[in-house]
Amino acid sequence: IDFAYRNYGSRSNIHFIQADIRQLPFKKSFFDYIFSDQVLHHTKNTATSFKYLTKFLIKSGFISIYVYNKKAPIREYVDDYVRKKTVKMSVAECTEFSKDMAYLGKALSKLKKKITIPRDIPLLGVKSGTYDVQRFVYWNFLKCFWDESDNFQRSVGVNFDWYYPKFAYRHTASEVKKWFRDAKLRITTLKEIESGISVTGIKR
């Protein structure tokens, strides 16, 4: 927040407030638009955090969220196994591990090889098609992000953002749709990609 304030604090239409997203210092029905990008899945309960946020939305107000999508089952298993260890690391230790994952991702990426899966493997959550080797490993087996523009620091940061936070929940589109229904929000847009789910809804 200090970085953001230094760069944009002089603008009259922007206000920076640092607070617990589950204990916000605002009255109910305060905002006409709420935007929460890649935040809710890092709270202790994504669904209840979302429900809490909607209390601050005025009638006919909009809310937009992005949450992590659930991955293939082996990737989910490995994520949980590794994260049980990385969340207990110091910042320095997890940074080093995140560098290891970036180097691994880079090594796989530099192969410049494709793999073709002739048909779906439902038990593994693998879809048929032709994949870059690094992308295939990344989406189906292990988070080892590598930025194709060779931005090493960004690659380390993306890996760190996955492995260090105490909470990093993944969800399905069905789950997210239910949150909106339960909060009496009508979904106006929904986009699901491998990494996550983006949804915007309006309060009825």
Give, region by region, the residue ranges found by the protein language model.
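A short glycine-rich, Lys/Arg-flanked "PGG" loop and its adjoining helix->strand segment in the class I
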Residues: 47-62
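Short conserved AdoMet
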Residues: 9, 44, 58
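Conserved class I S-adenosyl-L-methionine
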Residues: 62-116, 129-136
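Conserved SAM-binding loop
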Residues: 4-5
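A short acidic, Gly/Pro-enriched loop at the edge of an enzyme's catalytic core
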Residues: 22-34
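A short SAM/SAH-binding and catalytic strip from SAM-dependent methyltransferases
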Residues: 32-45
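C-terminal lobe and adjacent flexible extensions of AdoMet/dcAdoMet transferase-like proteins
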Residues: 133-204
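Conserved SAM-binding strand-loop segment of SAM-dependent methyltransferases
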Residues: 10-23
